[in-house]
């Protein structure tokens, strides 16, 4: 079970994120790399660390949909009910992105991938730090890292590695285009 970060570590993580830093943290199936969704420096660092093309876009996780609303266009009551039928859980939805969302975050798309995670550690982390980018901690196309030690070995001092255990999921979250209902992953 994930315990809340001690106050000093929480303050350090918050300052690190605000300065454009990147965190490595446990998620449902692997460790993820994250930064603040509106921080271009952090987004560029993640893309560089992973060797990920900037046209692909990244996922943002939050503790609840209310935390993610400023990043997407308004969703009506029926749409919110659809989201809540799958959240919290391992489903990522592509929603129309707010016009202020950085292209580095959404890639070449007009949508943004968002998820309300059921992983207790992610929920606690986003409660304390706000919504975070969540992309697998790995080099693009390679195996995802499963623990903090592997993240330290791979990324060294370039990321702040937080303690935590991954969930039991063996696969990454499903990705569903909200408008069409099409399952993309």
Curated annotation (Swiss-Prot):
Keywords: ATP-binding, Cytoplasm, Nucleotide-binding, Nucleotidyltransferase, Transferase, tRNA processing. Its EC number is 2.7.7.87. One of its GO terms (biological process) is tRNA threonylcarbamoyladenosine modification. Gene3D superfamilies: DHBP synthase. GO terms for cellular component: cytoplasm. SUPFAM superfamilies: YrdC/RibB (SSF55821). It catalyses: L-threonine + hydrogencarbonate + ATP = L-threonylcarbamoyladenylate + diphosphate + H2O. One of its GO terms (molecular function) is tRNA binding. It is found in: Cytoplasm. Residues 7-185 form the YrdC-like domain. Signal peptide: none annotated. PROSITE patterns: YRDC (PS51163). Belongs to the SUA5 family. TsaC subfamily. Required for the formation of a threonylcarbamoyl group on adenosine at position 37 (t(6)A37) in tRNAs that read codons beginning with adenine. Catalyzes the conversion of L-threonine, HCO(3)(-)/CO(2) and ATP to give threonylcarbamoyl-AMP (TC-AMP) as the acyladenylate intermediate, with the release of diphosphate. This is Threonylcarbamoyl-AMP synthase. The gene is tsaC.
